[in-house]
């Protein structure tokens, strides 16, 4: 049922309730019955109102139905209504109401499922990897989730900025530099004098080789960095290694089909004095104290749910990692992004309350729930029934590029989106490569490709299909498919509201299933010209909405398989 139809039906039900219970304030909710035989849409409004009104719920439901069906507008939407169980009202739509989705999709095309621009803007920060190695499968899940959430925001009318925050300051960058230095001097990772916390993947050898060859590299938003070849200068090695890995990560993201609007460097917060300014402000506001030679933030007093106070400045003088995060999010707010979303691994859950506490301590008018967070569990990769743990190039983990090379980016994107972010996910390489109904990407894309082939072989023109009479679409499998297509805008809205693109992934699988069921139940290219065109129009409508849904996930809609 289209959203506009739902709004109209709710208004009509409220008018019917007002006739039965003039004093009642009806909060009408509609839902799709779990069993198709029970109708197209249902409400429990009679059960909600019966007890306070001291009425029998079934009798009240019948009164509401009688008052509803007395309205001419209701009869245009509702074919019949029946009372079920303790007082549910199940509705069956008229054929015209069921078929209205076909014209809605035809008139809106790519815009079907999208909302008007709302004048609001949002910053979504994701991936945000340390420039210390290739992107891994956890970053791939962030990339898939983050880009899909950005696409959902865009579909919901927001102006979206994708941002990548580079943690290019701190001990990990120092470890990267000394690792490259050691490999450049011929020290192997298993040698006793190799850095204890050094990185051991083959990519370290590649960086050392290019550094010695005095090559130049450039990240997508940076100036070229030319290697000096001086292994005694850790500063030179550090600058080249960071630029090298930023470029490598850029290439990984390009292979994924993902482009960021902005890159933000952690080091810039130190260089600009924003980190020190943040600390000074928190001290001046009285939200800190000294203990054991360290500076502590009174996070337990700042109303964000932290269970203990947190160290900001360690006794040796260095800042803990959440301090620049507070400074960074203050900068986000000052840039006018009063709605921001961070997508991070669930191992970062402890930082949520700390960062929000720091922002509250700045007393800058920032809401307590800023920023919003989507925390995801990690990914286990399986192949041939065994877990794949190591990539030779990375040294200790499976890379994002590995996944793309193995199964293609469409499969990577869909598979990493199809489950709730807060659930662990097993990426089955064999399943992603299979050409079977069990592979959801293949199943959905095959539905789209099958429609393209069917229309191409039909001999019908686009104009003929567009003018087909949808009143001929009366088979149960056609009604089921029409109902599914009508749900799409509401699924998009729900996914955007909950920052949960898996809703779209589920819907795509269900829609493909409904299409295949219809295709197997009813011949499309029948001898009767009018019926053939009507069914081709339903197929074309399905193709359009499948393509719209796949686009929200960043997955292609192929014309042939």
From Swiss-Prot:
Catalytic activity: tRNA(Arg) + L-arginine + ATP = L-arginyl-tRNA(Arg) + AMP + diphosphate
PROSITE patterns linked to this entry: AA_TRNA_LIGASE_I
Top class in the EC scheme: ligase
Pfam families named among the record's database cross-references: Arg_tRNA_synt_N, DALR_1, tRNA-synt_1d
Motif 'HIGH' region, chain ranges: 129-139
Gene3D superfamilies: Arginyl tRNA synthetase N-terminal domain (3.30.1360.70), HUPs (3.40.50.620), Isoleucyl-tRNA Synthetase, Domain 1 (1.10.730.10)
A single BP term in Gene Ontology: arginyl-tRNA aminoacylation
Cellular localization per UniProt: Cytoplasm
Keyword field: Aminoacyl-tRNA synthetase, ATP-binding, Cytoplasm, Ligase, Nucleotide-binding, Protein biosynthesis
One GO CC term on file: cytoplasm
One Gene Ontology term of the molecular function aspect: arginine-tRNA ligase activity
SMART domains on file: Arg_tRNA_synt_N (SM01016), DALR_1 (SM00836)
Signal peptide start-end: none
InterPro entries tied to this protein: aa-tRNA-synth_I_CS, Arg-tRNA-ligase, Arg-tRNA-synth_N, Arg-tRNA-synth_N_sf, ArgRS_core, DALR_anticod-bd, Rossmann-like_a/b/a_fold, tRNAsynth_Ia_anticodon-bd
Keyword Cell inner membrane: no
Enzyme Commission code(s) on record: 6.1.1.19
SUBUNIT field: Monomer.
Family designation: Belongs to the class-I aminoacyl-tRNA synthetase family.
Protein name: Arginine--tRNA ligase
Organism: Bordetella bronchiseptica (strain ATCC BAA-588 / NCTC 13252 / RB50) (Alcaligenes bronchisepticus)
Gene that encodes it: argS
């Amino acid at each position: 049922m289209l959203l506009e139809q739902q709004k109209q039906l709710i208004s009509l039900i409220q008018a019917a309730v007002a006739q039965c219970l003039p004093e009642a304030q009806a909060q009408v909710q509609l839902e799709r019955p779990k069993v198709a035989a029970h109708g197209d849409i249902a409400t429990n409004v009679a059960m909600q109102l019966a007890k306070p009104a001291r009425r029998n719920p079934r009798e009240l439901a019948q009164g509401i139905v009688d008052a509803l069906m007395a309205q001419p507008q209701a009869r245009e939407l509702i074919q019949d209504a029946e009372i079920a169980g303790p007082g549910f009202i199940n509705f069956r739509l008229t054929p015209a109401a069921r078929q209205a989705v076909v014209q809605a999709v035809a008139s809106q095309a790519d815009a079907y499922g999208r909302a008007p621009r709302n004048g609001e803007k949002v910053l979504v920060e994701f991936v945000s990897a340390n420039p210390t190695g290739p992107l891994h499968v956890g970053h791939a899940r962030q990339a898939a989730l983050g880009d899909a959430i950005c696409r959902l925001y865009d579909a919901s009318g927001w102006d979206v900025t994708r941002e990548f925050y580079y943690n290019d300051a701190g001990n990990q960058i120092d470890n990267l530099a000394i690792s490259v230095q050691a490999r450049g001097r011929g020290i192997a990772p298993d040698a006793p004098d190799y850095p204890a916390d050094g990185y051991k993947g083959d990519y370290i050898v590649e960086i050392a080789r290019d550094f010695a060859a005095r090559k130049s590299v450039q990240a997508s938003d940076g100036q070229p960095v030319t290697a000096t070849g001086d292994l005694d200068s850790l500063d030179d090695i550090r600058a080249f290694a960071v630029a090298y890995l930023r470029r490598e990560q850029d290439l990984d993201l390009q292979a994924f089909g993902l482009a960021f609007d902005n890159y933000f460097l952690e080091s810039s917060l130190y260089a600009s004095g924003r980190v020190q300014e943040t600390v000074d402000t928190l001290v001046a506001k009285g939200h800190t104290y000294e203990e054991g030679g360290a500076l502590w933030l009174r996070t337990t007093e700042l109303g964000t749910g932290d269970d203990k106070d947190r160290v900001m400045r360690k006794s040796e003088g260095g800042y803990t990692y959440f301090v620049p995060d507070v400074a960074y999010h203050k900068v986000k707010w000052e840039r006018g992004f009063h709605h921001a979303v961070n997508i991070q691994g669930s191992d970062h859950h402890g930082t949520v309350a700390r960062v929000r506490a720091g922002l509250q301590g700045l007393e800058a008018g920032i809401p307590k729930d800023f920023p919003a967070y989507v925390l995801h569990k990690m990914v286990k990769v399986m192949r041939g029934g065994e877990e794949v743990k190591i990539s030779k190039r990375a040294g200790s983990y499976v890379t994002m590029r590995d996944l793309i090379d193995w199964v293609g980016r469409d499969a990577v994107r869909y598979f990493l989106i199809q489950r709730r972010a807060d659930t662990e996910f097993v990426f089955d390489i064999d399943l992603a490569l299979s050409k079977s109904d069990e592979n959801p990407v293949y199943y959905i894309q095959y539905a789209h490709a099958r429609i393209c082939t069917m229309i191409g072989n039909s001999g019908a023109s686009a104009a003929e299909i567009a003018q087909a009479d949808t009143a001929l679409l009366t088979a149960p499998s056609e009604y089921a498919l029409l109902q599914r297509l009508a749900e799409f805008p509401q699924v998009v809205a729900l996914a955007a509201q909950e920052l949960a693109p898996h809703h779209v992934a589920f819907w795509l699988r269900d829609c493909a299933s409904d299409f295949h069921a219809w295709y197997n139940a009813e011949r499309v290219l029948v001898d009767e010209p009018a019926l053939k065109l009507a069914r081709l129009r339903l197929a074309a409508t399905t193709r359009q909405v499948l393509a719209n849904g796949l686009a929200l996930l960043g997955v292609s809609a192929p014309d042939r398989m």
